[in-house]
Regions:
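A cross-kingdom marker of C-terminal helix-rich interaction/assembly modules
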Residues: 1-54, 110-122, 162-328
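Short non-catalytic regulatory patches outside canonical folded cores
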Residues: 46, 50-57, 69-159
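Helix-boundary capping/turn motifs
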Residues: 59-67
Length: 328
């Protein structure tokens, strides 16, 4: 996602050249404090709107990644309050607005132009509206419909979900909470103040939800940027497949149908480079295989290097939608 931001800056998505009539030029020069507002009233409204949406997309994505990085670093250091306080904005607010932008660009711009303080406050959106926006964004992605709008809403917004992130967001920002039984601060306690940083229970309940939200975020950002940048949807689809393979290995119970499918597709390509012993991707070795692109042979002990993206290309495995697929 950071690479996409660099590509966007290099492509001059933030600038444009326009030819205005003499009357439009006079209006533009007479209102130097609001050039965008003036341009929106000219014959170049469509171009100006595209420029403004590009600015919004880039600024929101950059801000989201800044908070996300610092939040994840804080969690890795077991600074729970700081981590969840920082993650609240990118996951609860920014990601929702980017979802709306991908789902319905016209509606997003209408609300943005009329005043975000009125139409874009989170409290203005009911749960069913949020789910509808998430569904629209999922449908508009470059990749297959892999995510659940209900699960996203319940994870990020539902304060009655004991396994969601919404409770932790509130507890990290407030010493005392009382919304419901799940959120109510216990007697003789303050939220997180007396939490033992060595306890791992927070990671057990939140990392699966964070991983799911981050995969969704990747789908949103790549799909939005594809509207203005040339993006290889097959490459994106293979990256998402790798993410889901690791996610299944780390967080899903029982056997993984996805790993079985990958093993079958790779076939004879998956073998030791020294003794040619066939390899099988299992939950125990899948994270290292897909992230480090290596697997240790149980027969000879050699550590074989595998070019994962090349293998996926040879096996024709990808979660990308066909190029001619229209949103359903």
């Amino acid at each position: 996602m950071l690479h996409l931001l660099r590509e966007a800056d290099a492509s001059h998505m933030r600038s444009m050249e326009v030819d205005l009539t003499s009357e439009e030029q006079q209006a533009f020069l007479a209102t130097p404090e609001d050039p965008i507002g003036v341009l929106l009233q000219t014959s170049k409204r469509v171009e100006t709107k595209r420029l403004l949406l590009n600015h919004v997309m880039l600024a929101l994505t950059a801000d989201m990644l800044d908070f996300l990085y610092d939040g994840l670093i804080a969690l890795s250091k077991r600074k729970y309050v700081v981590g969840f306080a920082l993650l609240r904005k990118p996951l609860r607010e920014t990601l929702f607005y980017l979802s709306l932008l991908l789902s319905d660009e016209e509606e997003f711009f209408r609300l943005f132009e009329n005043g975000p303080a009125h139409g874009l406050r989170l409290r203005e959106f009911r749960p069913d509206q949020r789910k509808s926006i998430f569904s629209g964004a999922i449908n508009a992605m470059l990749i297959d419909d892999l995510f659940s709008a209900t699960h996203l809403n319940d994870t990020v917004f539902d304060k009655s979900n004991p396994n969601g992130l919404a409770i932790l967001f509130d507890q990290a920002n407030h010493l005392v909470t009382s919304f419901n039984a799940n959120l109510k601060t216990d007697s003789l306690n303050f939220n997180f103040v007396f939490k033992n940083p060595e306890d791992d229970d927070v990671f057990h309940t939140t990392y699966p939800q964070l991983a799911y939200a981050l995969m969704y975020m990747f789908g949103i950002v790549t799909s939005l940027f594809s509207r203005t940048l040339p993006i290889d949807r097959e490459y994106v689809g293979r990256l998402v497949l790798i993410m889901f393979a690791v996610y299944h290995s780390l967080f899903c119970r029982g056997s993984s149908g996805l790993l079985r499918q990958i093993n079958l597709a790779f076939g004879e390509l998956l073998k030791c480079s020294v003794c040619e012993m066939p390899f099988v991707i299992r939950k125990s070795n899948a994270p290292r295989f897909f992230v480090a692109e290596r697997m240790v042979c149980k027969r000879c002990g050699s550590d074989t290097d595998f070019p994962i993206l090349w293998l996926l290309g040879q096996a024709k495995l990808s979660f990308a939608k066909p190029a001619d697929a229209s949103p359903r």
